[in-house]
Design a protein with these regions (language model features):
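Short, small-residue-biased leader/transition segments that mark boundaries at the very start
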Residues: 1-3
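Phosphate/diphosphate-binding loops
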Residues: 147, 155
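C-terminal helical cap and adjacent loop that interface with cofactors, partners, or active-site loops
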Residues: 76, 89, 95, 99-113, ...
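Active-site beta-strand termini and strand-to-loop segments that position acidic
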Residues: 138-143, 166-168
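Short catalytic-loop micro-motif centered on adjacent basic/acidic residues
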Residues: 20-23, 148, 218-219
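Predominantly a Rossmann-like dinucleotide-binding segment in NAD(P)-dependent oxidoreductases
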Residues: 14-22, 26-129, 162-164, 171, ...
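Catalytic-core regions built around general acid/base machinery
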Residues: 5-13
Length: 280
């Protein structure tokens, strides 16, 4: 499925008055809603830049080829180790750190970035697969507004999953709490409200919207956030600056062609080499 298919699916869901709730669960977290509200209501002034992190260890390390059971097909082996293949997981930026990308898009009122550049690669040798273990992306919006995402999955490193928003009147943080400060760094607000389970809130609001005849449709922002992550991955893999339109109209096919044959030979691209891997 390509971006145009998803966009069309969202359109059809709206026409049929169907609910479409995305997996961007933090949008249903009370504390996140409150702090993003501060970013968007003028409390910290005009937003000039944001920085989001998802620094953690490997999610599902690729096992050695010697552990592969005799007779197991390529597709089964890849499916069982799905995280390590771009065509199955999207890479760490699009699978795990996509939640941080969604935070960035939330702060930017879900407006697509105009362009991005990225650096990344695989620092620690893997037993197989073709995903990076780190990538950093710099996005740009009109007026010189910037968004920066840092993602890493390497054992033994500092871990963090935070978000920092810099405004003309102050700053907002998701880092050991949810709060704002003035330009001097003095705290001006801290979230101290209820913290119900965001997954439960997500389901409660979904069901309530259906019963009320006004089904929630998160489709547009789901597509935009996911595409922003894919755009960052493309920029990281190729080493090129990419525009939103380039990414949206990419002709790249990352899924193998012979997926109908469970026992067939499956070839996947090698690990991307920035500057050599071409944008398609």
């Amino acid at each position: 499925m390509c971006s145009s298919d998803l966009i069309e699916s969202v359109k059809i869901a709206k026409q049929k008055n169907l609910a479409m709730v995305a997996g961007f669960c933090w949008r249903y977290d009370y504390a996140k809603r409150a702090v993003f509200g501060k970013m968007l209501d003028g409390t910290i002034g005009d937003l000039r830049a944001v920085y989001g992190t998802y620094l953690t260890g490997p999610v599902k390390p690729m096992p050695p080829a010697s552990s592969r059971p005799a007779g197991m097909s390529d597709l089964e082996w890849m499916t069982r180790n799905w995280y390590n293949f771009t065509w199955l997981s999207g890479d760490g930026l699009v699978e795990q750190a996509i939640h941080t990308v969604d935070w960035m898009m939330w702060a930017m009122k879900d407006q697509p970035p105009t362009s991005c550049t990225a650096t990344g690669g695989r620092q620690i040798k893997a037993e197989g697969g073709n995903i990076f273990d780190h990538i950093s992306v710099a996005y740009e919006w009109p007026g010189g507004v910037r968004g920066f995402i840092a993602q890493r999955q390497i054992t033994g490193c500092y871990g963090e999953n935070s978000f920092y928003a810099i405004g003309t009147k102050g700053n907002a943080y998701i880092h050991r709490g949810h709060y704002t400060t003035d330009l001097a760094g003095e705290r001006t607000w801290k979230y101290e409200g209820p913290t119900p389970d965001m997954y439960q809130v997500e389901h409660d609001e979904l069901f309530a919207s259906i019963r009320a005849g006004k089904p929630i449709n998160n489709g547009d922002r789901m597509v935009t956030s996911t595409m922003a992550g894919i755009m960052g991955r493309m920029a990281g893999y190729t080493g090129q600056q990419l525009t939103w339109e380039q990414a949206l109209n990419s002709k790249e096919e990352i899924a193998p062609q012979n997926l109908r044959d469970w026992n067939g030979k499956v070839e996947v691209p090698p690990l991307a080499l920035p500057g050599r891997t071409k944008f398609i």
